[in-house]
Amino acid sequence: METKLNYKHLLGIGPLRSTGSKFLSFCSRNHGLLIFTTVLFFISACRSEIVPEPFLPSYAHEAYQYSLEQANLDRTALGRSWKEAGENALYKPEDITLPYQEEFYLDPAEVNAVGYRFFVLRGLRIEIEMTIHSADSLQLFSDLFRQSGDPELEFTQVASANRDSLRLEFEPRRDSYYILRLQPELLRGGRFRVLIREVPSIGFPVQGKNSRAILSFFGNPRDAGKREHHGVDIFAVRHTPVLAPSDAEVTRVGEGEIGGRYVWLRDQKRSINMYFAHLQTQEVTPGTRVVAGQIIGTVGNTGNARTTPPHLHFGIYSRGPIDPYHFIAETNRRPAGITGDSLFLGELVRSKQTIIVNNSPGSGNLPIDTIVQNSIMKITALTSNLYHILLPDGSSGYIAGNQIEMANNAIKEQILTDAVRIFDTPGISAVCVTDIKPGEKFAVLGKFKNFIYGRTFEGRTGWIPSL
């Protein structure tokens, strides 16, 4: 089941970018329209994704946002920032490649949300696990969206993590980009770890074999190019058991000139029909139910395969033939281990040398900036051997490890000859936090562009223009 985030048409409050959720107030004004909305919701919730019941899409995030509005917190800078952070996580996610593992820090004194965008092929099941390390109990809103080509919808919510299990999984029915959004309650934070991986959605159909036994693939030419191969051929010795890849119903058992002895199974959950051909024996009868792993026949070379070594022709059909490879082929890929120093997580650091900043942690990353030695930055996440950094101007990116150090110890001390104002950020919109009188010391901790970051004799930190 999936939930269309079309607030304009379903809930009457405009697209996701609109300001101020009116979901519950809208419903209270018109109970009749609420009933119509509910019916329309279930009609629109077509089975485009397979989501286990504990992970069905929920409106917990929107309900929490409504509670902020009821408390008039949406009129405060803090409440507005929470909503904007959730939207930014969808509209400006980090592009990643699966499998992926990251440890990140969300400061409870700040308002944050994170988003990850990744591409998923049909036939795979995506498994997402979250871990929370926080001194306080908190709710982490974990929602999964599919990017939509419809500008009115923009995103389609397909799954939500169960709060107790902090786990989420789903099976797409189309090749598409998906976005995972993670956002805690207001004034809650800590260290988090997220693991996103992909696995085949059904079992391998030949006992004791794996994808290395597939020697002929979907789309390969047949009959001198007159037709295409609508399945995969899995080679094994004669009489090797053929297994039901999932719970299913036996719909047909028979014999034909091309497929030889065959069996058809119907997986109602996934709306697919599975075809097993060239069988030596058939061990099931039409109308019966089978469970995943049950023997339904044995490998042979009947039909037009009599001149080839024994093998199973396995096909999947859903409104036509589809490539079964990703449904059954093991991924055998683990995310790279996190080797960065977790002591840096959530801390201000400075560069030990000139550093190239890349736009993403994946193999297709591109350089987007270069920062000079002693530049100040904040470490917000660790993944493999990379650090995700936030620069003082709000830009972000990824840098390689072993190029940073804590920005605690002074690089040098300066005695100021003139009065200087210290600002909270290095920019024209900065706010003055304190003043330094002539003759006072200023410990230089780092810099960023035309500003110096440091600490006063009283221990106040901030930015001053380059001297």
Label each residue range with its predicted role.
Residues 42-45:
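C-terminal motif of bacterial Sec signal peptides marking the signal peptidase cleavage site
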Residues 47-114, 197-223, 228-230, 350-353:
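Non-catalytic extracellular/lumenal accessory regions of secreted precursors
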Residues 47-51, 62-63, 106-164, 176:
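Acidic, Ser/Thr/Pro-rich low-complexity intrinsically disordered segments
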Residues 57-59, 63-74, 78-81, 89-97, ...:
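SH3-family beta-barrel domains
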Residues 173-261, 292, 301, 312, ...:
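Surface-exposed, glycine-biased beta-strand/turn segments
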Residues 245-283:
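Zn2+-dependent peptidoglycan hydrolase active-site motif and core
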Residues 259-264, 384-388, 449-453:
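Short aromatic-glycine-enriched beta-strand elements
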